[in-house]
């Protein structure tokens, strides 16, 4: 049996990276491959830890300091110390940070790992800082990783050196989901809406860590415009994060407190997605969001920014708007597209697009074992 260390460049929470790897972990042949999880920072999702333990894995956290810009010193120090004490042949690194992928790969190879995988899950801000970090990281990303994985071509181009892209030395691993657990069900929808006391509401939904990338600030502006036009609207926010307090203050300031459900971390994602009417994801950047695929699997229309790669599996349920559009224009477009939409089961469309987790988990297992 092969033991794989899954290294995260951010805290372990309920984000897309965690969702992706847990979908793989639940469906991979655990007689052949087992996972351990490591973060140089902390884990704020106890249910995640419990499930990992139940599947045979371990979670290691070093309690380092983390902010939305990352903490390079703690990342290097804590990962280095951990790998001096724990040895793995295969180390798989996940991060939204090019720095974490590059320096994590170096530390992993220096520890004696034979296979070091860097995995790009998203894009980012194309500014001077990004260009500088990519230039400085390129030598490490060419020298130390043995394998390069990405959720989309855009995510690969964003993180990996041009040589890797040109020579196609990377694998695309789709952000696949379990279609047996994520589907539209009218009974689940009615039951969940009743439990949340939103039976007669127009429910705008969002799942994501409260971080700069997810652009909650603009999301609140969009919802504010929606509720002006549809008075019975509510906004459902699922997640936690460093900017949660700041967003809560904005909600209170706009007088939206009674119209926003802040549900923190939840494990009943299928139920909550079924309860929603639309899903809005105005991120500054994404690779291919797991939550977008999950939303479409439950028949939701997904309204997202052009910062998200145009690879969501069900094209007819995907709407991409520039962040240059005003919040009012976003709101108008969302209400216009929703009007007359009849929700349906999209399970077969998801499978046909190659997003079935059984197939993806088998591919990942083969990549680990070869």
Regions found by a protein language model. Name each.
Residues 6-77, 169, 242, 367:
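N-terminal strand-loop element at the rim of the active site
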Residues 144-184:
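A short, active-site helix/loop in glycosyltransferases that binds the activated sugar's phosphate group
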Residues 248-264:
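Nucleotide-activated donor-binding/catalytic signature segment of Leloir-type glycosyltransferases, i.e.
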């Amino acid at each position: 049996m092969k033991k794989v260390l899954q290294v995260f460049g951010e805290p372990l929470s309920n984000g897309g990276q965690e969702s992706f790897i847990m979908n793989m972990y639940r469906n991979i042949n655990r007689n052949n491959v087992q996972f351990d999880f490591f973060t140089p920072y902390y884990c704020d999702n106890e249910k995640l830890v419990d499930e990992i333990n139940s599947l045979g894995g371990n979670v290691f956290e070093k309690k380092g300091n983390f902010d939305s810009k990352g903490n390079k010193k703690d990342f290097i120090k804590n990962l280095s110390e951990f790998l001096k004490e724990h040895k793995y042949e295969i180390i798989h690194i996940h991060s939204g940070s090019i720095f974490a992928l590059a320096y994590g790969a170096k530390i992993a190879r220096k520890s004696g790992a034979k296979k070091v995988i860097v995995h790009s899950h998203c894009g980012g801000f194309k500014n001077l800082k990004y260009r500088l970090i990519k230039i400085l990281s390129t030598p490490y990303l060419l020298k130390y990783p043995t394998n390069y994985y990405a959720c989309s071509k855009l995510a690969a181009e964003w993180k990996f050196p041009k040589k890797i892209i040109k020579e196609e030395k990377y694998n695309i691993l789709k952000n696949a989901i379990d279609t047996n657990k994520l589907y539209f069900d009218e009974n689940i929808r009615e039951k969940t809406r009743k439990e949340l006391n939103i039976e007669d509401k127009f429910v705008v939904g969002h799942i994501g860590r409260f971080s700069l990338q997810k652009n909650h600030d603009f999301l609140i502006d969009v919802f504010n415009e929606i509720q002006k036009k549809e008075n019975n609207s509510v906004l459902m926010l699922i997640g936690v994060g460093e900017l949660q307090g700041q967003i809560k203050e904005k909600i209170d300031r706009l007088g939206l407190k009674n119209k926003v459900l802040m549900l923190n971390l939840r494990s009943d994602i299928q139920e909550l997605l079924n309860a929603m009417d639309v899903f809005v994801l105005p991120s500054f950047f994404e690779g291919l969001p797991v939550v977008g695929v999950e939303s479409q699997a439950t028949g939701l229309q997904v309204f997202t920014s052009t910062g998200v790669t145009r690879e969501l599996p069900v094209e007819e349920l995907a709407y991409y708007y520039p962040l240059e559009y005003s919040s009012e224009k976003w709101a108008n477009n969302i209400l216009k597209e929703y009007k007359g939409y009849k929700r349906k089961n999209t399970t077969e469309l998801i499978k046909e697009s190659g997003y079935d987790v059984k197939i993806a988990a088998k591919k990942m297992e083969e990549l680990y074992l070869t």
